[in-house]
């Protein structure tokens, strides 16, 4: 996992995309228990996103309002495809700050870059915007999550050397999968000297229950 101002981040993150619910509402009390246990085990990295329904608000209640700000690291994401205009895209950042109450983001990602959408991040001038927020101290580490092949990854990292880290889908089942390109993307990020965070390490839970045959 990345390094925050010289402090090694323990190598396990808490993904906040799918949180427990009571009916149709996130069970914040259960999330509090989960967050507390995660911190007690020595881990610190929490990962949410603007487009995860209710997640940013839940993590404010379960984590930010209950623990010292320097006891955890928080990542969230901006998704250009959920923004019809540049103004709307920038508003996502402000809204994420308000929802989480975090004051700043230890990690901030442009969300889910792939072949059919990466140009929209350029069109909406979002690379410039997130650089500005980092200069203001509202972002500590800047990155993007990625869902494509090594050619596009190489292009993006060449054009945006300011990136501190990249989030990749990596697991042993997809290491040589041409549709995921775990190995090739990992090697490309390393070639550029970028730190890597991993998503889908157990492939959506499938690797926790592999088929018997």
Regions found by a protein language model. Give the residues of each.
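Beta/alpha (TIM)-barrel catalytic core signal, keyed to glycine-rich beta->alpha loops juxtaposed to Asp/Glu
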Residues: 113-213
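Active-site mouth loops of central-metabolism enzymes
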Residues: 17-29, 77-88, 115-119, 213
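Active-site groove signature of glycoside hydrolases
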Residues: 97-118
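Conserved, mostly hydrophobic/aromatic
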Residues: 14, 38, 46, 59, ...
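Short, acidic/polar
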Residues: 24-39, 85-101, 148-158
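A short, structured active-site edge motif that brings together acidic residues
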Residues: 70-82, 108-113, 169
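A structural motif
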Residues: 9, 43, 102-105, 139, ...
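N-terminal binding-site loop/beta-alpha segment at the start of enzyme catalytic domains
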Residues: 1-72, 129, 135
């Amino acid at each position: 996992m990345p390094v925050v101002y010289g402090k090694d981040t323990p190598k396990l993150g808490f993904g906040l995309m799918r949180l427990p619910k009571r009916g149709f509402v996130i069970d914040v009390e259960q999330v509090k228990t989960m967050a507390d246990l995660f911190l007690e085990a020595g881990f610190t990295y929490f990962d949410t996103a603007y487009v995860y329904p209710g997640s940013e608000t839940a993590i404010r209640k379960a984590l930010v309002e209950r623990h010292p700000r320097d006891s955890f690291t928080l990542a969230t994401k901006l998704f250009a495809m959920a923004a019809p205009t540049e103004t709307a895209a920038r508003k996502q950042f402000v809204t994420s700050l308000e929802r989480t109450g975090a004051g700043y983001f230890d990690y901030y990602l442009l969300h889910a870059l792939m072949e059919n959408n990466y140009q929209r991040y350029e069109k909406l001038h979002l690379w410039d915007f997130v650089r500005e927020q980092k200069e203001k101290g509202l972002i500590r580490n800047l990155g993007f999550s990625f869902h494509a092949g090594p050619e596009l990854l190489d292009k993006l990292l060449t054009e945006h050397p300011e990136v501190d880290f990249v989030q990749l889908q990596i697991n042993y089942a997809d290491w040589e999968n041409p549709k995921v390109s775990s190995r090739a993307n990992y090697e490309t990020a390393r070639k550029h000297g970028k730190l890597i965070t991993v998503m889908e390490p157990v492939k959506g839970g499938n690797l926790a229950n592999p088929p018997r045959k």
